[in-house]
Amino acid sequence: MKWLLLISLVALSECAIVKVPLVRKKSLRQNLIEHGLLNDFLKNQSPNPASKYFPQEPTVLATQSLKNYMDMEYFGTIGIGTPPQEFTVIFDTGSSNLWVPSVYCSSPACSNHNRFNPQESSTYQGTNRPVSIAYGTGSMTGILGYDTVQVGGIADTNQIFGLSETEPGSFLYYAPFDGILGLAYPQISASGATPVFDNMWNEGLVSQDLFSVYLSSDDQSGSVVMFGGIDSSYYSGNLNWVPVSVEGYWQITVDSVTMNGQAIACSDGCQAIVDTGTSLLAGPTNAIANIQSYIGASQNSYGQMVISCSAINSLPDIVFTINGIQYPLPPSAYILQSQQGCVSGFQGMNLPTASGELWILGDVFIRQYFAVFDRANNQVGLAPVA
């Protein structure tokens, strides 16, 4: 009888996990290259990827760089309204707002994407509260509204979200996503909007106050965001838990960054944000420049750090030690291969914090390590992908 009860509890736990599949598409960068627009984009955009993090007044204005999303390849589908209107979004642990284009937006970027129409939803409730998210060449401005958001099998009712009225530049016209679904803490949400996952938990729609992410390395499909639980089939060994050092982003403390047993950065410890909404692995400019030089990467006319694909067979691992556990990244992880050749998965940025230099552990890292974002205990769980 005890075994039957245990089996039933395990089955109940598995059923309680809501999985949202992510598909892999061409990135915004690749689309801009194919349309001959990347050089113009780079001329007009702020070169600082750090602009996404720590805005001056997060309750009023969230500052983000479009360049953070340029190499994103993983996207999921949500529905907003009754009946649901579908949108392709980035599930972004590095921001906290949900926003999508609306019919109020006539910018070129909006015209090429799905736009939310409040008049076609029987459950929409409008507000007169503005929202503004600043980018390098202008702002996404709009209004906040409430409606039911369908995420996987979850109907997240009375969810606040942004309806864009203007979107910056024509470059988002080629973006493979409609909007952003932020999964960071409410402390960094623009206009004080309650994030989607917080609302799910407050409404009792998930069984555990956590979500987890698996990013597939090579398949067009297979990647997934899981709400309310952990599926151990996606990782090997045990999850190692790392305390969140500052609630806002999913920020943790890193002990060191080494190569060939030698510290190449973060020798006295540093901070890192685990961010599904940043494709590359970003760190202090000087440290990244040294890494790029060591691995033989050089900048091309598109601003990418290109590298010989043969280097994958000869370069060493780069090892992040976090909470006493080593997390190696092999060259096959930090060198990104495509039909056009190979590029470095590292990106330089300067954003010192009160606790030391800051790194961003983006998709280059998460493809290697299954990640659990545990709000109940304010910790991140990491384990090698299966």
From Swiss-Prot:
Which segment of the chain is annotated as a signal peptide?
1-15
Q: Which residues cross the membrane?
A: none
Instruction: Look up the record and report any one GO term of the cellular component aspect.
Output: extracellular region
E.C. code:
3.4.23.1
Q: Which GO terms describe its molecular function?
A: aspartic-type endopeptidase activity
Q: Which CDD domains match?
A: pepsin_A
Q: Which residues form the propeptide?
A: 16-60
- What are the residue boundaries of the Peptidase A1 domain, all occurrences included? 74-383
Family (UniProt): Belongs to the peptidase A1 family.
Please give one Pfam family short name. A1_Propeptide
Q: Which UniProt keywords apply?
A: Aspartyl protease, Digestion, Disulfide bond, Hydrolase, Protease, Secreted, Signal, Zymogen
Record PANTHER family: BETA-SITE APP-CLEAVING ENZYME, ISOFORM A-RELATED (PTHR47966), PEPSIN A-3-RELATED (PTHR47966:SF22)
Enzyme class comes to hydrolase
Name the catalytic site residues: D92, D275
Its localization reads: Secreted
Q: Which reaction does it catalyse?
A: Preferential cleavage: hydrophobic, preferably aromatic, residues in P1 and P1' positions. Cleaves 1-Phe-|-Val-2, 4-Gln-|-His-5, 13-Glu-|-Ala-14, 14-Ala-|-Leu-15, 15-Leu-|-Tyr-16, 16-Tyr-|-Leu-17, 23-Gly-|-Phe-24, 24-Phe-|-Phe-25 and 25-Phe-|-Tyr-26 bonds in the B chain of insulin
Biological role stated in the UniProt entry: Shows particularly broad specificity; although bonds involving phenylalanine and leucine are preferred, many others are also cleaved to some extent.
What cystine pairs are annotated?
C105-C110, C266-C270, C309-C342
Protein species of origin: Canis lupus familiaris (Dog)
Gene Ontology biological process: digestion; proteolysis
- Originating gene: PGA
Chief localisation class: secreted
User: This protein is called what?
Assistant: Pepsin A
